[in-house]
Amino acid sequence: MAASAFLLIASFLLVLMALAKPLGSLLARLINGEALPGVGGVERALWAVLGIRQEEMDWKRYLLAILLFNTLGLVLLFAILMCQGVLPLNPQNLPGLSWHLALNTAVSFVANTNWQSYAGESTVSYFSQMAGLAVQNFLSAATGIAVAFALIRAFARQSATTLGNAWQDLTRVTLWVLMPISLIIALFFIQQGAIQNFSAYQPFTTLEGARQMLPMGPVASQEAIKMLGTNGGGFFNANSSHPFENPTALTNVVQMLAIFLIPAALCFAFGDAVGDARQGRAILWTMTVIFVVCVALVMWAETTGNPHFLTLGADSAANMEGKESRFGILASSLFAVVTTAASCGAVNAMHDTFTALGGMIPMWLMQIGEVVFGGVGSGLYGMLLFVLLGVFIAGLMIGRTPEYLGKKIDVREMKMTALAILVTPALVLLGTALAMMTDAGRAGMFNPGIHGFSEVLYAVSSAANNNGSAFGGLSANTPFWNLLLAFCMWFGRFLVIIPVMAIAGSLAAKKAQPASPGTLPTHGALFIGLLTGTVLLVGALTFIPALALGPVAEHLSLVK
């Protein structure tokens, strides 16, 4: 089992890095504003048709464009979901969503969270899936990448007042990165057996003679961007454990690679854009080290399983509950860590059925801000916040003004960094407390004990950190839960983006100073250790008390 786990992790990472390096070079060209071969004329025509001026924006205009773009997307998606009963491509005649579910869903997909308080096959029409949810899968991913582009330019430029053009970044990322790769992945999924049609649901008779319905729909096209854009919202309620979404072991691997592809590529792009590839590799190494340790822990917890199984006559204590037999424990464990390390949230197994420790690791990966690869764009700018915090701590220890890539980190940057890092923990802890203190919050809990608290903590952690996965065991389609989670999703997304853009504007205006003998190298093993320690320390100090009340207590009750 250990050898199989090692081979699975090693082969996954090798293929990932081989794919991410060339994509990183493409992203670096987009960051630098270089014209891509063969598309320059297309872009110029597009700017003219759309009325996009090619002048660059300062950080305030860039931020305003991002906020306006996403707010308009929220309004449009909310309207589509409310009115889907009278819109086309609705062969099952599904009615419009309730106002609070429509609001929750619209916020969820615009904020790149894809939390779902509904079952897709019984709630959302084909038109809503394609024109609403799938479109936002592209646009929310492009938003995260655009913000990352702006922050990377801030480190790469000197004495600059602008960070690029938001409209051009959103358009170029969508047209030349997200759409082509999604098309390739979608065609591969169709070849492997994922469905892509507009048929009405198909009736069939089971072996027991019961009549049931097979849901249909344009699944493969949405599945591709769902994974590539670290969105995660499933076409069906079973998400990537459904054979129509994830039909084979090969598609399972491709889905995991798609989740990490752009976050890993952005690390390479960062190194290329700032003129020092070692800087990007240091961040990538930090992410990889934490990721490998977390995967190993989950695999160990799930293969060790529940010792009480043996006393009840089971052949093995290994925990196969809630997992697809065609994927098994190792692939399910790897998928769980990949989807929660990134802000994806897609699942090929039910996280609620993992062991206490096996479920705690995915929860903790979300709680530290999903900076271990993380979401497209958001993972890199989230980790760069920890980089700034790490060099600040190092500067305090050696008595020097902290600096990164030659740029001094002043009070303004540290205030914004602290604000961005503290937003999601505050939302998680306050949201969980509110849910546990109110009758409306507790009414949604199917498990009132220790595990019930873990389910609530997981749900709010998932929403505030824009992941979207769930433990289950929670009746979330109520006004209280829909509004609470919508609040956490929206502000967990944009109250981080706002200080990140402020940091970008401040850093872009600074000149890079040449390195001196006392400058902390930010590309070696020492810095990788410092950055890893910073991430772990912040996560430990913030969430250990809450985790002790949930999964830790549950584990201790199991082994006592």
From Swiss-Prot:
The membrane topology of this protein is: Multi-pass membrane protein
The GO terms describing molecular function are: P-type potassium transmembrane transporter activity; potassium ion binding
- Annotated membrane-spanning segments are 6-26, 63-83, 132-152, 175-195, 250-270, 282-302, 327-347, 356-376, 379-399, 416-436, 483-503, 524-544
Write the record's keywords in alphabetical order, separated by commas.
Cell inner membrane, Cell membrane, Ion transport, Membrane, Potassium, Potassium transport, Transmembrane, Transmembrane helix, Transport
Name of the coding gene: kdpA
Give Gene Ontology CC terms.
plasma membrane
The record describes the protein's role as: Part of the high-affinity ATP-driven potassium transport (or Kdp) system, which catalyzes the hydrolysis of ATP coupled with the electrogenic transport of potassium into the cytoplasm. This subunit binds the periplasmic potassium ions and delivers the ions to the membrane domain of KdpB through an intramembrane tunnel.
Q: Which Pfam families match?
A: KdpA
Fill in the subunit field for this protein. The system is composed of three essential subunits: KdpA, KdpB and KdpC.
Taxonomy of origin reads: Bacteria, Pseudomonadati, Pseudomonadota, Gammaproteobacteria, Enterobacterales
Protein localization? Cell inner membrane
> What's this protein's name?
Potassium-transporting ATPase potassium-binding subunit
Per the record, the similarity remark reads: Belongs to the KdpA family.
Q: Which superkingdom does the taxonomy of this entry point to?
A: Bacteria
